[in-house]
């Protein structure tokens, strides 16, 4: 990686803050010794919140520094996409972590997933990218914002799905003993998935309007658009199954994770192996 790029020190600093938040979150839920009392101080949660907020601010500075350096926002290359997603996922999770104390232990699931992106972005070169004329469109901003909300809500659902799955083992029951029952966690996870479906639907609509303005067609069934539709369909089917049948919590959690994996591949895989006209749901 080119260490001379202005955004790199800020990127490293932001990821370091996320790493500290991850380690503190894990330290906070893990029992210190056998027979430890069930009630523990939650002071560590304030440290996690502070580190996450700091990471979001530092990544915002990194994005701003790159914007000034290359003249456009982080919408084109995989390096830019990963950096902007690390910022938006962190921002939305900070808000959820702050407003919903009951889901805070799920940070030990969510933050390592974010660190997959963090490790990935550090392997890429921060070369300047070309900003195509089709991106000078106000609908692009709507499409981008809705997409970021969609992925962040999915990630919050994945955190709770991980709790449901890990509670099938003793270590998970000990780590997440302060969280509500599986029934409540499952309901909250699927509420996030319902919201994700709303934002996914709006994102596809905004993307279609943008495509009409940019390329003269609403939908072309290229690899990216097909993958995006299949993700939407998989999410809708998952919600239908969850609402129509008595699904065991283990299966429920696996469905949520499967939906996220498909969305992850659509965001970070398909755009870069497809000859589609645009780079993806940035």
Region annotations inferred by a language model:
Residues 7-34, 42-130, 144-169, 184-214, ...:
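Hydrophobic cores of alpha-helical transmembrane segments in multi-pass integral membrane proteins
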Residues 171-183:
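Juxtamembrane inter-helical linkers in multi-pass membrane proteins
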Residues 134-145:
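Acidic/Ser/Thr-rich, low-complexity mid-to-C-terminal regulatory regions of eukaryotic proteins
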């Amino acid at each position: 990686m080119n260490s001379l790029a202005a955004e790199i020190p800020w990127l490293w600093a932001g990821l370091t803050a996320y790493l500290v938040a991850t380690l503190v979150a894990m330290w906070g839920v893990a029992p210190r010794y056998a027979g430890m009392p069930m009630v523990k101080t939650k002071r560590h949660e304030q440290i996690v919140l502070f580190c996450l907020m700091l990471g979001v601010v530092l990544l915002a500075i990194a994005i701003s520094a790159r914007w000034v350096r290359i003249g456009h926002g982080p919408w084109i290359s995989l390096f830019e996409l990963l950096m902007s997603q690390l910022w938006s996922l962190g921002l939305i999770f900070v808000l959820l972590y702050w407003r919903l104390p009951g889901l805070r232990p799920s940070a030990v699931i969510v933050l390592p997933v974010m660190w997959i992106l963090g490790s990935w972005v550090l392997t890429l070169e921060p070369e300047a990218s070309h900003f195509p004329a089709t991106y000078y469109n106000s609908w692009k901003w709507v499409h981008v914002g809705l997409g970021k909300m969609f992925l962040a809500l999915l990630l919050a659902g994945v955190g709770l799905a991980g709790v449901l799955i890990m509670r099938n083992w003793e270590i998970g029951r000990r780590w997440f003993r302060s969280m509500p029952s599986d029934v409540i966690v499952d309901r909250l996870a699927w509420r996030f998935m319902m919201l994700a479906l709303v934002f996914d639907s709006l994102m596809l609509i905004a993307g279609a309007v943008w495509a009409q303005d940019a390329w003269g067609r609403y939908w072309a069934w290229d690899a990216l658009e097909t993958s995006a539709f299949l993700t939407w369909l998989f999410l809708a089917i998952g919600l239908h199954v969850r609402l129509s049948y008595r699904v065991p919590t283990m299966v429920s959690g696996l469905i949520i994770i499967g939906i996220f994996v498909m969305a992850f591949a659509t965001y970070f895989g398909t755009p870069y192996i497809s000859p589609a006209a645009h780079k993806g749901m940035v």
